[in-house]
């Protein structure tokens, strides 16, 4: 999603691959997968982001997500 990242492509791709393996293991349909991933995002925001920054971080995440699926 991000244009510049402090994480390597290898780190990101490895984490994505592991998450997708879990979803495939559970034969999770798309709607369940999105629900679970969304709940993970909420969990991270609530526990790892200071309350005064949560709304802005959530909005930045949503904007980046929308941009990542936007048709060219």
UniProtKB/Swiss-Prot annotation:
InterPro entries listed in its UniProt record: UPF0352, YejL_sf
Family: Belongs to the UPF0352 family.
Protein name, entry field: UPF0352 protein SO_2176
Domain of life of the organism encoding this protein: Bacteria
SUPFAM superfamilies: YejL-like (SSF158651)
Pfam family, one: DUF1414
HAMAP family in the record: UPF0352
């Amino acid at each position: 999603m991000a244009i510049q990242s402090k994480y390597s492509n290898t780190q990101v791709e490895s984490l994505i691959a592991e998450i997708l393996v879990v979803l495939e293991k559970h034969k999770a349909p798309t709607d369940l997968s999105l629900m679970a991933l969304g709940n993970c995002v909420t969990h991270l925001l609530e526990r790892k982001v200071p309350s005064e920054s949560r709304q802005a971080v959530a909005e930045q995440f949503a904007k980046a997500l929308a941009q990542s699926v936007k048709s060219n």
